[in-house]
Amino acid sequence: MKEHAPSRRDFLCSTSFVAVGLATGGSMILAPDNAWALSPTALDSHTAQTLVVMARQLFPHDRLGDQYYATVVEAVDKQAASDAALRKLLTDGVARLDGARGIAWVQLSNGARNAVLKTEEAGEFFSTVRTATINNLYTNPLVYRFFGFEGSSVEHGGYIDSGFDDIGWLPNA
């Protein structure tokens, strides 16, 4: 797979994650592949990192870095700070994932992780993480560019007035 050089925006976004993480201190997860950090306040580092991997496992996109999936966990962590039931649901869910095969779930192969997730599929934990991922990953303006979405058009008069048919990837009819 061909790697693309990071843009100025990628660089600034990545370094801002690190700067904020260093400024806040506390428990911080540093990713080995990119310069970003996650500083959970309600969840422990292991739970937060597992949820990042779970979000990626549920909605994998090769071109998206883990820092985009970390925004999902940041949102859930913020909610869990004021909701003890949610915090317990997430920590218990991660404990079940880890206990399914006797080792940390994140250390399993993709196939084994999927098999363990399949056992959680009907439960509230799975549903909560899936919904949080959809609501926080796909509404992130920084993610739009990876999918060729130009963002909301409401502020600019709607799609009809701004050339809704100007996209280049549809065949000419």
Features from the language model and the residues they span:
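Short acidic alpha-helical/loop segments enriched in Asp/Glu that coordinate divalent cations
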Residues: L64-V72
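Residues marking the start of alpha-helices
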Residues: K2, S39, R101-A104
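Alpha-helical structural elements of signaling/regulatory helical domains
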Residues: P60, L64, S82-A85
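C-terminal segment of N-terminal export signals and the immediately downstream linker at the start
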Residues: A5-P6, L22-H61
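Hydrophobic/aromatic-lined pockets within catalytic cores
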Residues: S16, V20-A23, F59, R63, ...
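N-terminal secretory signal peptides and thylakoid transit peptides that target proteins
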Residues: M1-L22
